[in-house]
Amino acid sequence: MDVTAEAKQIMVQALGKMYSSRSQRGGLRLHRSLLLTLVMKSARDIYHSARLMSEKSGQSVTEECTSHTQEPMDTSSSTATPLRETSGQSSEDGQRSGLEGHPHPLNPAADKENCGPSRPDRHSRKRRSKTATDSDFIPCKKAKLECAEVRGVLQNSSANCGRALDSLSLVPMPRTIVTF
């Protein structure tokens, strides 16, 4: 199928689904995100199949190319592939261990999808704490008062409830004003 015809088919399907989902509660917004996922998956499958076709045409193997263009690529593991790979697994392990230290073994541009951000000047979207930005560390807790300071504060704020020679006046009592 031609790429433009497939794109038109996806667009018609998307418009039909958006029209039918507009009456649902929150359906349109949810459908847009699901539709974007569907379009990206189908575009990725088309890209990979076209890439396989260009690689296979260089090797002049046309039978395998037609099978890849008719079905989208399956990313899940199949049971037939591990049976064939068990005999050559020990030789592949030796090759893989040599490549583990290198994140881009052959072609760094081949795996753009799984790479980090290409520009180092791009800022992260995480919020930074104030302590990370300030060079001077300011403690968030208040300093505790010493016992002598607490007594002095309580004596200054105590009420004079009795006579000067009364024993009750020696006990500090904080002032409390109740309002209704």
UniProtKB/Swiss-Prot annotation:
Region (Disordered): 53-135
Subcellular location: Nucleus; Cytoplasm
Cytoplasm in keyword set: yes
Keywords per UniProt: Cytoplasm, Nucleus
One GO location term (cellular component): cytoplasm
Knocked-out gene: effects: Morpholino knockdown of the protein causes severe deficits in laterality. Partial loss of Kupffer's vesicle cilia with the length of the remaining cilia reduced. Double morpholino knockdown of IER2 and FIBPB causes an almost complete loss of Kupffer's vesicle cilia.
Biased composition (Basic and acidic residues): 93-103
Pfam families, per database record: IER
Bias kind Polar residues: ranges: 56-92
Keyword presence, Nucleus: yes
GO biological process: cilium assembly; convergent extension; determination of left/right symmetry; Kupffer's vesicle development
Function of the molecule: DNA-binding protein that seems to act as a transcription factor. Mediates with FIBPB FGF-signaling in Kupffer's vesicle ciliogenesis and in the establishment of laterality in the embryo.
UniProt cross-references to PANTHER family, sorted A to Z: IMMEDIATE EARLY RESPONSE GENE (PTHR15895)
Quaternary organization: Interacts with FIBPB.
Family listed: Belongs to the IER family.
Name of the protein in its database record: Immediate early response gene 2 protein
Organism: Danio rerio
Gene name in the database record: ier2
